[in-house]
Amino acid sequence: MAVDSLVGRIAGVSYLHIPARDAAASAGFYRDVFGWQLHGRPDEPGFSDGTGHVIGRWVTDQAAVGADGLRAYIYVADVDDTLDAVTTHGGQVVRPPYLEGTLRVALFADPAGNVLGIWQETSDSQGSR
């Protein structure tokens, strides 16, 4: 039976809660750095990531996810440019870019203290498809 869905995939990661004390400020950070589309009330913003695969919202009743625990990674076109945007908009670089196999990866903390990763494909990974 077909089921209509906002993200259209079964068993894929599709919905996130992002902890933040100030949901509106955190939403602005992700909008400005990653271009995420915001919706809902300003005090309880939701988002879609622009790919059609991930949606979510900011929650103020949970502690930030620091360096330990499950970590989400966001696919970006350029790790260095994204880290520049992260720091410009109040985030911090937690681990500078490094290679993980054929991927270029870095870790950052958003202004609320959540640690996430970003990654881009290298020319080696793109050539091996």
Regions found by a protein language model. Name each.
Residues 35-69, 115-121:
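Conserved short beta-strand elements that form part of the metal-binding/catalytic scaffold
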Residues 22-37:
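Amphipathic alpha-helical segments
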Residues 15, 59, 69, 85, ...:
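Residue-level hotspots at or immediately adjacent to binding/recognition sites across diverse folds
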Residues 41-45, 99-101, 125-126:
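Short glycine/proline-centered loop/turn elements that form peptide/ligand docking sites
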Residues 50, 105-106, 128:
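Short Asp/Glu-rich motifs
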Residues 16, 26, 30, 82, ...:
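Hydrophobic pocket/interface hotspot
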Residues 1-25, 53-54, 70-72, 121-129:
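N-terminal beta-strand motif that seeds the catalytic metal site of vicinal oxygen chelate
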Residues 22-23, 74-115:
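Vicinal oxygen chelate
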